């Protein structure tokens, strides 16, 4: 199966971090025990120096099969994907992970929650409108904004139950929900803004024309009527991709980044 080949071919450079330190921080975030002393303590930990667990060493065939089957199900089910070719399906619906989060069975969880809602609200063929419907459901639960610790991504199951973090986590939750519903989306980012010297991420929707439309649940609705923007001055922007991008891989740690 070509979908399995795509995932396996690009699997070697994907990994998660592990350690009791991350387990403890996740528990603290889940309980929102965010007192100054705890934060000060964990700021001294270099989370990105913890051991890496590579997907190729731990992933199971059952995990891949479930992910592929559910991804194919929504790709074929929804009419807006008639114009979504296999290559774009592989990048914007199929991937089982986002970045360096622990592996989890997120797709079934989000599928079972969000697809019944989408199916009850919309029966059309417009992917932009479908995206709006899921955005409407996502914005019902606000993200608890927290930026004090620099840690690897949290897994999809954790974020489903505990919405805490900053723009990165907001994008992750949105991506999980949209892909579980067969809506092709990506996360884009810049490393540095000339305006406020910081990192930022946002989501984009792949329209049926191949155009990518910026959106943010609760703040910026996806639309074709105008070029949407969050009004931030951006430096060079990149798009996260699961497949290794030869032109930018060496620049950004050999992971799947693409200039946009």
Please place each PLM-identified region on the residue numbering:
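Secondary-structure boundary elements
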Residues: 1-162, 198
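Surface beta-strand/loop "capping" patches
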Residues: 254-260
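Hydrophobic/aromatic-rich core segments of domains that either
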Residues: 116, 121-137, 147-157, 163, ...
């Amino acid at each position: 199966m070509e979908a399995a080949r795509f995932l396996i071919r690009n699997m070697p450079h994907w990994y998660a971090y592990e350690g009791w330190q991350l387990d403890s921080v996740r528990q603290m975030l889940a309980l929102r025990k965010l007192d100054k002393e705890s934060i000060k303590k964990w700021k001294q930990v270099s989370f990105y120096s913890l051991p890496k667990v590579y997907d190729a060493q731990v992933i199971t065939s059952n995990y891949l099969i479930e992910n592929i089957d559910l991804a194919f199900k929504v790709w074929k089910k929804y009419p807006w994907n008639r114009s979504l070719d296999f290559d774009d399906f592989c990048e914007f619906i199929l991937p089982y992970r986002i970045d360096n989060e622990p592996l989890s069975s997120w797709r079934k969880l989000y599928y079972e929650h969000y697809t019944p809602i989408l199916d009850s609200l919309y029966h059309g063929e417009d992917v932009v409108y479908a995206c709006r419907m899921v955005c409407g459901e996502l914005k019902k639960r606000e993200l608890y904004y927290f930026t004090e610790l620099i840690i690897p991504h949290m897994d999809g199951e954790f974020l489903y139950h505990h919405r805490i973090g900053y723009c990165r986590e907001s994008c992750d939750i949105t991506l999980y929900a949209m892909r579980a519903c067969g809506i092709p989306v990506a996360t884009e980012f810049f490393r540095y803004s000339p305006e406020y010297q910081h990192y930022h991420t946002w989501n984009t929707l792949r329209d049926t024309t191949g155009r990518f439309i910026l959106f943010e649940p609760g703040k910026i609705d996806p639309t074709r009527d105008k070029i949407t923007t969050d009004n931030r001055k951006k430096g060079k922007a990149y798009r996260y991709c699961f497949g290794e991008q030869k032109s930018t891989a060496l620049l950004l740690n050999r992971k799947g980044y693409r200039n946009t």
